[in-house]
Amino acid sequence: MPTIKQLIRNTRQPIRNVTKSPALRGCPQRRGTCTRVYTINPKKPNSALRKVARVRLTSGFEITAYIPGIGHNSQEHSVVLVRGGRVKDLPGVRYHIVRGTLDAVGVKDRQQGRSKYGVKRPK
């Protein structure tokens, strides 16, 4: 507990909250260009080939973003929309690519949870 004299000398500092997605600069999404599309293996105990892309954002950051859903058309020079949200079993992947916008098409033949994968309602 500080004394009154100590509080006069230097006031209490507010607790600064640290963002989990600094590359978005406080925006809900950011546009970017894919520089590399590849697969990586998840941490133990999971095993798969997770599709990720290295993306150069309009904010100037170069990030690794996860490509959700089964199958994708993303390749180098694709323009994509990136949102926050980490992938728990991929260290260093703190962003998701938004499917169904810009160059990232929606997931083919998706019936449930369509809004998360950019799929229109089937006729």
Swiss-Prot record:
GO biological process, one term: translation
Coiled-coil positions: none
PROSITE patterns: RIBOSOMAL_S12 (PS00055)
Keywords: Chloroplast, Plastid, Ribonucleoprotein, Ribosomal protein, RNA-binding, rRNA-binding
Any Pfam family the entry gives: Ribosom_S12_S23
A cellular component term, taken from the record's GO annotations: small ribosomal subunit
Gene3D superfamilies associated with the record: Nucleic acid-binding proteins
rRNA-binding keyword on record: yes
Record-level Gene Ontology MF annotations: rRNA binding; structural constituent of ribosome
Subunit details: Part of the 30S ribosomal subunit.
Record function comment: With S4 and S5 plays an important role in translational accuracy. Located at the interface of the 30S and 50S subunits.
Family: Belongs to the universal ribosomal protein uS12 family.
Record protein name field: Small ribosomal subunit protein uS12c
Organism: Oenothera elata subsp. hookeri (Hooker's evening primrose)
Gene (name only): rps12
